Each structure stands twice: as C-alpha cells, then as structure tokens.
Amino acid sequence: MTMDQKTDNAGKCPVAHTAPRGRSNRDWWPDQLDVQVLHRHSDLSDPMGKSFNYAEEFRKLDLDALKRDLHALMTDSQDWWPADFGHYGGLFIRMAWHSAGTYRITDGRGGAGQGQQRFAPLNSWPDNANLDKARRLLWPIKQKYGNRISWADLLILTGNVALESMGFKTFGFAGGRTDVWEPEELFWGPEGTWLGDERYSGERQLSEPLAAVQMGLIYVNPEGPNGNPDPVAAAHDIRETFARMAMNDEETVALIAGGHTFGKTHGAGDPSFIGADPEGGAIEDQGLGWKSTFGTGVGKDAITGGPEVTWSQTPTRWSNYFFENLFNFEWELSKSPAGAHQWKAKNAEASVPDAYDATRKHVPTMLTTDLSLRFDPVYEKISRRFLENPDQFADAFARAWFKLTHRDMGPKVRYLGPEVPAEDLIWQDVIPPVDHELVDDADVAGLKAKILASSLSVQELVSTAWDSASTFRGSDKRGGANGARIRLAPQKDWEVNQPAQLARVLSVLEGIQRDFNASQAGGKKISLADLIVLAGNAGVEKAARAAGQEIIVPFTPGRMDASEAQTDAASFAALEPRADGFRNYVNSSRLQFMKPEEALVDRAQLLTLTAPEMTVLVGGLRVLKAGQPEHGVFTSRPEALTNDFFVNLLDMGTQWSPVEGKEGVYEGRDRKTGAARWTGTRVDLIFGSHSQLRAFAEVYAQTDAREKFVKDFVAAWTKVMNADRFDLV
C-alpha cells in the first residue's frame, strides 16, 4: 500500500480494514531537525520507576548460583533450537560478541551497555540472525533472577560462562549495565537496504562515525569485501573496522581466532528458505524471526548466514586448532550449500566433527576473513607467534574479550561484582583515587576570588571549563573534566580548544593551584581538574552579576589529575569533536552525512542533555563568547549572562540572508535601514527556524525570563561539569 492509499483510507472504519497510519511529521518533512532523540529513555518509558537502583539490586545477586544455572544451560539442548555439538557455547559467544561488537570509538555509541540487542534494528540485523533464539534460551534464567541481573549484563555474563564452560580462563567480568526500554535511534549508515555499502567514498574510505562495512553487519563481510573472496583485501576491511572498535592488530587477531575456536556457522541451504526477521514477522511468531522451511529448519538444517564452517577439531573445547589448521593446510576456494564463498583444506583428512551426527567427519574449513590472519603480513606475524606460543594467545584473547565486552562501561568506578579484575588497563581511562583532603567552602570562596583577580576573562574561564567537561560522552562514559586531560596531548592541541588561549589559561590556573597547595598544612590540595571547573563556575557567577543576577554555581570537589602514562593519546583522539554547536565550531571536512545543527543535537545527546537544556546552554555560551566567538554573539553586553541571544534572534526587525562565499554563515540586517546587526551560523538560526526550538527560545526571550534563564543555564552547566562524576551517583 502506498502512503497516498493509506491517507485515502484514513476516514474509513478501522474495524474491517488494516488500521491506517497517517503521515507523520517526518513523512511530510523528512529533512526536519529531529530533537526528539534528546527525550528518549525517559521515566515515561521505564517500567522500573524512578526509585529503582540497579546497582543495589545487582549487589543482592548470588552470582555463583546464576553461573551454575548458566553452566547447566550450555548442554541443555532444546528441540525447538538444538545445540550444535550438544553445547550452546558457540551460540552464546556469538550473542555476547554481537551485543558488544556494535561499539564504535568515534562517538562511543553501540556496545553492550544497554542491552539494545533486544530491540530494533539490532534484533533484526542480518548479522544477528537467530540470536533471538539465544535470548529465548536465556529467558527462564532471566525470569528466575529478575531485577538482580539486567539483560545487558546477562548477555555478556553468558558469553563469559560459555567460554569458561569450554575450558577457557576469562580475564574477569563486571556488572553494572542498566537496561533501557526502547530502541536507540542511531545513525547506522546512509543505506536504505540491508548489506548496502553507500558509506564508502574514494579508495574505500569509510565515513565517520561508522565502523561496520555494510548496513546490518557487526564488523566485516565474512566472505570478503562485498562477497569477493580475497583474504588480503578483506584484511584492509578488518583492520579499519576493528580499529574503529578500538582494537589494535594483536587484539584483532586474538578476537577472531579466539571466537572461531568454538562452534560453527550455519549455511545448510539456500537463504531463500528463510522467513522474515523478528521485527517483520507474524504476530503468532511472538518475536522469533528467520523461520526456515528448509528441512526441519533447525539443527543440521539451520540457515543463519551463508557459510557452513567449523574451524576446530574440538569446537566445544579451548584449543590452538584454529592456528594449527590455518598454517598446516593450504586452502582452496569452495562454496557452502547456501552458495556462499568459503575455504576448505586441500588434501586434508576429515577430522572435524559433525554438529549432529557422531559418525561423520569433515575437512577443516575457514572463512575468507580467517585466511586474512595468514595472508596479511602484519596479521601473519602475530598469528605465527600465537601458533608457537599458545599461552600468549590465551592471555591476549582473554584481555581482548574483556575489553570488547566492557569497552563502553566507562571508568572502573562503575564496575560491580566480585569478578572485577584488580589490574588497571589503559583503555579504562584510569584516574587516580583521591589521596588528599579536599577543599572546603572557605577554600572555594578564596580560590574563586584569586581566579577573578587574575588576568583571565570570563570568556577564557568559561571556555576552558567547557572545553574540559564537554568531551564527556554518555554513550561510552568517556571524557569529561575529571582527569584534567585537557592539559595533555591530544586535547591541548585540538583546534576547537583554541590551543594558544588554552595554554595561557592553564598556566595561570596552575600558578594559582601551586600557590594554594603550597600554603596548606595537613595535605589539603586542589587538583587542576577541580580548579578548571571552579574557574568556569567563577566566570559564570561573575557574568550573572553583570546581568543583575546573584547566583552560586554548585561545586563538588573530588576530581583528580590523570598522568600521560594513564592516557592513551591515540584513543583520546577519537573524542575530538567533528563539530560542537555549543562553541559554534565545525570541521566541515569531517562532518559527513550531517548538517551543523544536526551535529549540535548529536553533541547534546552525547552530553545527555534535553532539548531545553541544549537551548539554554547555547544561548548562554554565545553571550559569554565561549569557544569560537566570531558569530552568534547577539548582544551588546558580551560576558554578561543575559538572555540577549534569544531576544535579538527573535527580533522581527532583523532580516537574515546567507553570506556570499561563506557556507553556513548568515548576516542579520535591520529590516528597514539595511544596516548590519549580527552574523550567525546555521546552529544559531535554527533556534528561530525550527518550531519546537523556537518555542523554547521564546520562553527565554520573555521579559520575565531573565532570572529563569540564569537559573536554568546554571543547572544545565552544572550537569555538564559533573557528567563524569560517577563517584557522586
């Protein structure tokens, strides 16, 4: 049925017909800026209620009992979805891997932290075919343990137990992933079809922030790039994709080989026998998808993807067979019963067991992407080392698996449970524990006085604090003011942070810090991380006074300063903004598939802000000249925390037009005289153009809103300054 047909039926009785769906606003105006992404995962969609505290529930969990039940499940094969080789280990490893494997380092989104594999689109991605069965196998255990284990934690814990049940020693497990209750609307790519690859440009350049090679895949195409069975070309895709998942070459080899030590793939027949995915299935299927009419549709007849591959002679036990087979045999291209490209060992004896017939054996088989670990020269060197040193392989896989499954959990302070490893790992963005007495209210007042008596302006104080704190990403809980990594590479050199100004501000603040700490008895200190935030607060308070408003910005000390040794500079490079509308900054060369105003909403979502919070922050930061002050400073009183940005933006006496030769820049002129008044960007003008954002702007432009504007700005500012203070939760 076309959209027009649906509209024509709108006035008819819905009882005897399919219920009509009228055009949504997005249907009418598909290019309209979507700010609703800032209002998802609210209390209104959470059945647990505001008082529910998952950390408290998890602490009540009998983890040993839960793991015993999971161990028992591994070999409790069910007729409706039988276990390969009598053991569900391979299936559950794939489930956990694919839950975590959507993570991408560029924006920190994806990953296992919210249990999103339960929802569309992930639950229906082609690469997640039949993982709905894995989650259904887990339901009786989830039902038994209830609120004490989230789905997000259970998916990862089950992967760990699967490994342990097959003889592998894992590195550890941390709970603390809180479930969400609605799908995340993320940008997974520009494609409108499964397995499309419009995300590439030039010489196979993958657009940011994407990590997977095709729509609906977790990583790479196992048959090779776009199904081309070329192991060397596939290595290029593997390296790029895994790097965008924050994995280096050694971790990549360990993960592929370790995961493919267990289980098998499923390509028993032509994919045309497979039915709809879970989201597209019939109501009587109850959320189970990919129903197959090939043979029995399950077990030996299962079709999940295309290849039909078993890598190891002991697919339910940890071994080094993957590397032994990879190097001991030569490989010839073949096809699976489903018609997919795969490789079989030349002149090899049948030594690999059949998953369902104990009397049958098969020759070893591999995927194109497996052979990449031998035929790419860098991967080959690592693979041979693992072949010759199985203990190094086991350790590398254990560590890489832990990183894969915990990468998006943020700092270690968020980890829960008795299996949290004691070792600090650099990718955890380690921050030292507080080792000194913290400043009190009198100290704070004295420090603010010294800061305001220094040579630093309100603009410099506010900009530096915002630069430090606004790196926070609610997606993977990275960044933020804690650690004061703004003084370290690479952040100190980012264009958006105005390096020359930043160096000058930090030099002054470090002097104030030294003087204060040297004057204290008993070990009382203030960290630079705390002082940067406190200085920003002092600047905001001074700006409020200049606008006729007295207010104290809340401040809680306890941040610490990270060292260079605790900072992976290459990893932190991913936090550099492609755009930050709060500072009117755009790096157009990196801003793909997004307009600047869309990037603003994207940044606001990473900061966990609502649309009103985003609005008031932009208005306040503009008049304080934070960031890039060339455009959008709609005030004659800069560095005073007024509502002038909104008042002047909504003034009908101003007429806006694009500036010739400056894409995305507009000039506002007096509607009668033509005299120039202001210049602004798309990010500035969206608050007058977009009907919902204009409604928020009107609230703050009202004559009676001056006090509310300052209070709301301070509340949103404090939220950003404390966004990474998980120790306060």
Curated annotation (Swiss-Prot):
Enzyme class, first EC level, given as a word: oxidoreductase
Annotated Gene Ontology cellular components are:
cytosol
Q: How is it modified after translation?
A: Formation of the three residue Trp-Tyr-Met cross-link is important for the catalase, but not the peroxidase activity of the enzyme.
Keywords in alphabetical order? Heme, Hydrogen peroxide, Iron, Metal-binding, Oxidoreductase, Peroxidase, Plasmid
Indicate yes or no for the key word Nucleotide-binding: no
Q: One biological process GO term for this chain?
A: hydrogen peroxide catabolic process
GO molecular function, a single term: catalase activity
Q: SUPFAM superfamilies this protein is in?
A: Heme-dependent peroxidases
Which EC numbers does the record give? 1.11.1.21
The record, for InterPro entries, names: Catalase_peroxidase, Haem_peroxidase, Haem_peroxidase_sf, Peroxidases_AS, Peroxidases_heam-ligand_BS
Q: Which cofactor does it need?
A: heme b
List the active-site residues.
H98
Q: Where is this site: Transition state stabilizer?
A: R94
Role summary: Bifunctional enzyme with both catalase and broad-spectrum peroxidase activity.
What family name appears in the similarity comment? Answer: Belongs to the peroxidase family. Peroxidase/catalase subfamily.
Q: Which PANTHER family match?
A: CATALASE-PEROXIDASE, HYDROPEROXIDASE I, BIFUNCTIONAL CATALASE-PEROXIDASE
* Protein name stated in the entry: Catalase-peroxidase
Species per Swiss-Prot/TrEMBL record: Sinorhizobium medicae (strain WSM419)
The encoding gene is katG
